Amino acid sequence: MFSQLFLKWLSEHFVVTIVLLSLIVPLRAFETLIRRWRLSRAQGCQGAASKVPVKDPIIGFDFLYKVLFEKSPERYLHSTWEAFKEMGTTYVEKRWSWQAVYTCDPQNIKQILATASEDFDLPEFRTSVIGPIFGQGIFVLSGHAWKHARAVLRQSFRKDNPAPFLETLERNFQAFVKRVPTDGSEVDLQPLFLALTMDVSTEFLMGHSTNMLSDKKDHTREQQFVDDYMICSEEIIQQMQLGPLHCLKSNRAAKRAKKRVYAYLDTFVEESLSSPKDGSENNFLTDMMATVSDRKGLSDHILHILLASRDTTSGLLGNLFFFLAKKPHIFAKLRYEVLKVAGEDPPTASQLRDMTYLKWCVNESLRLHPVIPTNARIAVRDTTIPRGGGIDGKSPLFISKGTAMFYNVYAMHRNEGAFGPKTEEFIPERWQDLRPGWGYLPFNGGARACIGQQYALLETHYVVARMAQTYKLLESRDDKEWMELYALALCSKNGARVSVSK
């Protein structure tokens, strides 16, 4: 009855109704402005210390041109570091249609990932780029779906006894050694590391290996999968670099590669499910089969886990041995330690923990070339970060809902205040007594920190130790400097071209 009377009154007072409706938007905008002002004042926020000068303040076509044409793909990460040196550790790029904050400040990154992580979520331009190519796996999920997938993955990675995993590593390492000539001829270790980590990851997580290092089968199908996977990975990164403008880019080759990737996965999953089982503990595939009802969803999760377990470890190994080959005195020092601790026998997990210099070398490679060098979040509500405001950039900065937050680990790892001088050089000794805290973030941080971190480090430490035991000399056959190939995980564009001798 009341609603009918109210509607009748509105119809009889049409002009008043229009006026009232027209006031709603400005009143809400004013209320938002006041609320944000109060939050900003309460937190002591000041205006951004550094803002990017823009030519197109509406859509940002000058930003699009800069990303597509002004930055060399092999120097993209270096250019971001140069931008921070020019603009400061936190700066703002503001348009009428969108706003982004770029930071390499450890305090801000800690705020985004841990202290106020509930204020931030995965950005749409990440989920809408990765999702259509690699599906709805753990790296694009949020909320309950993400927690569930992470719980299943944690169960797969939680191995109380590392001995069976080390046995898997040793068996695959012996297949790896057969592919490495010792007559002084050149070999690119990077694709071999890719094959090694692919075989280990699939056997460990799915109970069925791709056997890419086996000399008893044709690897055409597996190599096509690896090539297609890399095409898709590079396309994802190129689109993500465009941020909110990613929809303006399209790649037919990547779409064709995606179809072949899923066709391979469908076949491989069938082979894994039908392969003989020895009654051992469950793996990721069997755990996911119990919770994922459709084959597409299963393939999505597998693709994302391959990124976490294969790409990152192989990229780390390739980057590390690029520099070890360039610096034979470091490799000699590493080899001396490994032989002193473990002799010539395959090392145990306990012995690996005692190899201090080995861990320094791995840490230094992760510092210099973090396998996931940049990442992003979006503010889901009005919030603040502790640095970036005021003239000196040391005051809090207000972050409005919808602001894209790009945090750069690659640049953060070049902070001389945390890591000492010559941060562009590979110097493992810098890790003696070094405690960088949130200034060192090779595996992300907070609730979304890499769940397979210990798995990846154990695999890396083992392979590095076995390489040091197996080969007396490691020499570079590449006279060029390290160049980036920024796919979903960072690796050397020129590989790791070396010669070895026993």
Task: Give residue ranges: language-model regions.
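Conserved cytochrome P450 K-helix/beta-meander segment immediately N-terminal to the heme-binding cysteine loop
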Residues: V371, G393, K401, F406-L434
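Cytochrome P450 heme-thiolate monooxygenase catalytic core
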Residues: V19, L122-S128, P164-L317, K333
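Cytochrome P450 I-helix active-site segment
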Residues: L166, E170, T220-D228, N282-F284, ...
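Cytochrome P450 heme-binding "Cys pocket" and the immediately downstream C-terminal segment
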Residues: T182, P328-I330, A449, Q453-C491
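N-terminal membrane-proximal hinge/A-helix region immediately C-terminal to the signal-anchor transmembrane segment
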Residues: F2-H148, A163, E167-K178, L196, ...
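Hydrophobic, well-ordered secondary-structure elements that form the walls
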Residues: L334, S365, G402, F426, ...
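C-terminal, well-structured subdomains that either form a transmembrane helix-short loop-helix hairpin
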Residues: H301-H304, R310, S395, S400-A404, ...
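Short, small-residue alpha-helix embedded
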Residues: T312-A325, V463
